[in-house]
Amino acid sequence: MAMKKLLIASLLFSSATVYGAEGFVVKDIHFEGLQRVAVGAALLSMPVRQGDTVNDEDISNTIRALFATGNFEDVRVLRDGDTLLVQVKERPTIASITFSGNKSVKDDMLKQNLEASGVRVGESLDRTTLSDIEKGLEDFYYSVGKYSASVKAVVTPLPRNRVDLKLVFQEGVSAKIQQINIVGNHAFTTDELISTFQLRDEVPWWNVVGDRKYQKQKLAGDLETLRSYYLDRGYARFNIDSTQVSLTPDKKGIYITVNITEGDQYKLSGVEVSGNLAGHSAEIESLTKLQPGELYSGAKVTKMEDGIKKLLGRYGYAYPRVQTQPEINDTDKTVKLRVNVDAGNRFYVRKIRFEGNDTSKDSVLRREMRQMEGAWLGSDLVDQGKERLNRLGYFETVDTDTQRVAGSPDQVDVVYKVKERNTGSFNFGVGYGTESGVSFQVGVQQDNWLGTGYSVGINGTKNDYQTYSEFSVTNPYFTVDGVSLGGRIFYNDFKADDADLSSYTNKSYGLDGTLGFPINEYNTLRAGLGYVHNDLSNMQPQVAMWRYLDSIGQAASKSSDNNGFAADDFTFNYGWTYNRLDRGFFPTEGSRVNLNGKVTVPGSDNEFYKLTLDTASYFPIDDDHKWVVLGRTRWGYGDGLGGKELPFYENFYAGGSSTVRGFQSNNIGPKAVYYGGNDKDNCNKTSSSEVCSSDDAVGGNAMGVASLEIITPTPFISDKYANSVRTSFFWDAGTVWDTNWENTAQMKAAGVPDYSDPSNIRMSAGIALQWMSPLGPLVFSYAQPFKKYDGDKAEQFQFNIGKTW
C-alpha cells in the first residue's frame, strides 16, 4: 500500500501538501467513518468528482463544503495514490432532550427555543450551538434579576453515535432592589416619582402592582414612565442622563441610580397645522385647539395626534401620518407645536373576511357589520362591527386587521379574526339536599345553535318540591332589519311548603312570544303576549295570601288547609334594553340596563302589573382591564289593578347566588303569618294570638338589591385561560318588602315584624369564582352575612350552573 499523505488535519488548522500547479487526477473517492450520512449525500456536497484534477485549493474547498453540511465534527482528506480518502467523524445524533431545575421557564418554551436553533431529537448535535444556548438562557435569567443563575448542557454518549442532552438549571434567587435613587430632581420628591414605578425598593402589603424583584424590562418601562411624568407637566427639556444598576457582592441585592436633568417648565404658544389635510382642515384644526398659555404636555400631544388619525380613518384614510415637531423657545420658555399631516390615499373596502369562525356561519357574523363592501373605509364602522361581534357572546376574542390589496393603491380587505368559545351547555345531575331531597336536573342551552345564531334551550328539573320543564327558542334576526322573535312554553309543578316557602302547591303551564325591535346600535324595545294557567291547592291560611284572595272575591276558609282555586291570565309583556357592554360574556367595560314588565289584559282572572329593572356597570381600573369595578342593581315592583292585589305567587324574592349571596335562596323578606295560632306545625310559638309568625318566606311586591364587586386577576391561571375564569370580591345588599302590609295591633301582639318597612336591608361579603367550563358557566361563591334578621337562613357556600355577570 502506498504511503498515505496527510492533506488537511482539522477545521482550525489547515496544512496541506503542495502538489504543484497541475495537482493530480482523482481516480476514486473513498469515505471512512460514515454512519448516518449516506455516501451519495456526502459526494453531492463535495466540489470534487472522479476524474477531476485537484490541487491544494480544491482540497480546502472540499473540507469547507463537508463542514458546511453540519453533519461532521472533524474532516480529514488523505491521498492514497490516485484515490482520495476522506476520513470523517460524524456529529452524534440527539436521542432525547430533558430539562432539570427550570421553574421560571416552562419545558414547552425551552423546546421551542431549541428547535428554533436547530436542536431537536433526531438531529445532529452542534456543540457550538449549545454554548450559545447556554449563554442566551443565562442572559435571560440576568434580565429578570437572577444573577446567580447558571445553565449547563450535559451530553451523555450512547451506543451508535447517539447522545442524551440534558439542560441543568440552577436558577438561584431574584435579586431584590435595595434602593432606588433619583439624582437631579427638584420639582418632585424621590418618593413621589418612585410611586409611579412598578419596581420599588419598598412595597407595602396592599400594593399588588409594586415589585422589589429586579427586571430589566420593568426598569425600561419605569424610565419611560418617569420621562412621561415630566413631559406631561411642562418639562420639555427633561432628560435622563444616565442609569446605573449596581449589584451587591452576593448578587442578591440591586442598587439603581437614575441621573436626570429636569430643566424648566414650558408653556404652549400655539399650534400650526400643515400638510395634506384631505379637505378636512376645519375638523382637524378643531382637534388642535390647545389653549395658549397652558403647560406643555406630551400626553395631550399624543391624544391630539391620535384624534387626527381617528378622524381621517373615519373618512377612509387608513394609513395617515401625523408628526408633531415641538419648536422650543428657551428665551420665553414656550413651545410652539408644528403638526404635519399627510392623509395619504383614501381606500375602498374590497372584501370583508372572517377567520376562526369554525362553527358560526359567515352570515351570522356578516349581519353584524356596519362597514359595507365596496364603500369607503370607515374605521369607526369597522370598530362598530368588532363591538357588535363581541356583544354577541359567541367569541372569546375579536380582532380586526386592515390589509392592503396587492397591486391596488386604493383598496383594502377588512379581516375579523375571532376565537370561538363554547356557547352551549349540557348538564345532567343527580344530587341530594336537605330541602330538595333527591334531585335530578337535565338541561341543554345553546346560544348559537348550529352556528345559526339561534338561541335554543331545553331544561328540566325534578326533586321533592318541583317538577319543571321548559323549551325556548329565539331568532335574533327574524327579519333582515334585526327584529328578533322569541318564544317559550313551560310546565311547573311546585310545592312551596317543601321548598321552605309559604304553604301551597301550584301547577302551572303557559307560553309566551316576544318581538324585539332595535331602535339604534344600543337600544332595543320588546313587546309580546303571554298566557299562563295557575292551579293552586293545599293553601294553608296565611295573612298575605288571604288578603289577595279577598281582593279578587275568592272565598276561602281560615280553618282549612285544603283551599284552592285556578286562574287563567293573559299578559302584555314589554321591555327595553340598553347595552353598551364591551363583550357578551365577562364584560370589562360599559353598562347594561334591562327593563321588563307585564300587565294583564282583559279576559284575565287577575288584574296586576309587574316591573323589574336590572342594571350593571363595569369600570376598568387599569389599561389592561384586568382590574374592574362592577356595580349591579335589581329593582322590582308590582301591584294589583282595580282594587285587586298582586298574586302572591308573583311576588319578588331575594337571597341566593344571583341576588344576595350568603343567604339561602329566596329567604330574604317577609315571612308567612298563619291563621290558627299555635296549632300550626310551622309556627313560631311565641304568643297566644290567633295568628303566628313563621320562617316560611312569602316574598313581597317590592324588591331592591345592590352589589359592588372588585374583579381581579385570577391567581395561578395562565394567560391562555384568563378569558375563561373570573375572580371577584363582592359586597351584596338587598331587601324585599310588602307595601300593602298592615302592621296592626294583632300583628304586633304576635311578634310579627313590620313587613312594609323597606329599611330591613340584609348585607353580606365574600369571594366568587366564575368559570366558562366545557359544560357551561359554573359559578362558585363563599359569602358571610354580616347583617341579617330573625328568620333569615345563611348559606355561605353556593354553586350555580348557567349564569354569569
Curated annotation (Swiss-Prot):
Principal location class: membrane
Gene Ontology biological-process entries: Gram-negative-bacterium-type cell outer membrane assembly; protein insertion into membrane
Pfam families: Omp85, POTRA
Record's signal peptide: 1-20
UniProt KW keywords: Cell outer membrane, Membrane, Repeat, Signal, Transmembrane, Transmembrane beta strand
Record's keyword annotation contains Membrane: yes
GO cellular component terms listed in the entry, alphabetical order: Bam protein complex
Localization annotation: Cell outer membrane
Protein's UniProt name: Outer membrane protein assembly factor BamA
Sequence ranges assigned to domain POTRA in this UniProt record: 24-91, 92-172, 175-263, 266-344, 347-421
NCBIfam families: OM_YaeT (TIGR03303), PRK11067.1 (NF008287)
Keyword Repeat part of the UniProt annotation: yes
Function: Part of the outer membrane protein assembly complex, which is involved in assembly and insertion of beta-barrel proteins into the outer membrane. Constitutes, with BamD, the core component of the assembly machinery.
Transmembrane annotation, as ranges: none
Quaternary data: Part of the Bam complex, which is composed of the outer membrane protein BamA, and four lipoproteins BamB, BamC, BamD and BamE.
Source organism: Enterobacter sp. (strain 638)
InterPro entries (alphabetical): Bac_surfAg_D15, BamA/TamA_POTRA, D15-like, OM_assembly_BamA, POTRA
Homology family: Belongs to the BamA family.
